[in-house]
Amino acid sequence: MNSAHQIIRVLSIASAITFFMIGWPIAMATSAEGLKVSLSDDQEVPPVSTSASGNGTITVSPNKSVTGNITVSGMEPTAAHIHEAAQGENGPVIIPLTKGSDTTWSVPAGAKLTDAQYKSYLAGNLYVNVHSAAHKGGEIRAQLSPK
């Protein structure tokens, strides 16, 4: 009877050690973390001259779902999007943001990246920008660069 308890105890300890050595790092690597973004005119391509600015948080989860919002000031935005392109380049819209007020925009519920878009995100090749009537191609921008 004493041997059975020792075997159970050893197996329990071995299971716990296995989780912390293997499972815990995997769980930590797959957790989503919000990216703080700071949008500015000098990140646009080509750069523009404006006093507008913006900030917010965009979260991309390992299941490829996207959430977040941005707030802008010093401009009258007409549209906001997440695009796919490297820093210094322009790219196609992949997620149109939803206007919440004159100064806030949010990622729509259920937004999700494709496998290829998620790889681009991991490589730092997604960006968010906000358009205006004065700057139809974009007035302020921030690259989404995961840590």
Each model region followed by its residue ranges:
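Bacterial N-terminal signal peptides
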Residues: 12-24
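Metal-centered catalytic cores of metalloenzymes
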Residues: 2-5, 22-80, 84-147
